[in-house]
Amino acid sequence: MAAYTIASHPVRDFGTWKSLLDQFESIRKDGGELSAVVLRHSDDQNMVTVINTWDSIEAFQALFNREDLNSGMAEAGVTAPPTIIIGNEA
């Protein structure tokens, strides 16, 4: 059963953040990501929401807990911890 995540957080600069997100694509895919959609908030262009589909919740959790992902988020300019919703298809 597919799992879904919706993560929202501010970034210092969208272009920088998006470039680094794209660099992690193969790592995300190898970690069980099936798809990703990036949204920029209409009222704040440096606030983003990413909607992902995963093989499983466990796959997402394993990837999200990787140290290189967390340091990559800081390098990309994420300025606050993300708000994350995790769920399975009903």
Regions found by a protein language model. Give the residues of each.
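Short S/T/G/P-rich N-terminal loop/turn motif that feeds into the first structured element of a domain
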Residues: M1-S71, E75-A90
